Curated annotation (Swiss-Prot):
Signal peptide residues on this chain, from the entry's feature table: none
InterPro entries the UniProt entry points to: Complex1_LYR_dom, Complex1_LYR_ETFRF1_LYRM5, ETFRF1
Keyword set includes Mitochondrion: yes
The family this protein is said to belong to: Belongs to the complex I LYR family.
Role this protein plays: Acts as a regulator of the electron transfer flavoprotein by promoting the removal of flavin from the ETF holoenzyme (composed of ETFA and ETFB).
Chief site of localization: mitochondrion
Protein's cellular compartments: Mitochondrion
GO terms of biological process kind: negative regulation of oxidative phosphorylation; respiratory electron transport chain
Cellular component, GO annotation: mitochondrion
Keywords carried by this UniProt record: Mitochondrion
Gene behind this protein: etfrf1
Full protein name: Electron transfer flavoprotein regulatory factor 1
Keyword match Ion transport: no
Taxonomic source organism: Taeniopygia guttata (Zebra finch)
Amino acid sequence: MANSLRSEVIKLYKNLLYLGREYPKGADYFRRRLKAAFLKNKDETDPEKIKQLIARGEFVIKELEALYFLRKYRAMKKRYYSDDKP
């Protein structure tokens, strides 16, 4: 069981690292924060706590995806609609 949790954590880290490439404050900022967050919990051994942390990481993934989607939507809206009000 611990081995499957380990692989889930590694998969989560890689996924977050990939998503962090487009982070508004920069990829280096995101990478440092991500590494610090994972190192803070590296000694956790309780499987239930690890599952909670994985769930939190998946929530962060969803938030990042929403952030990127909204950023792209706003850029597209600026291109096609003027802010001039009659």
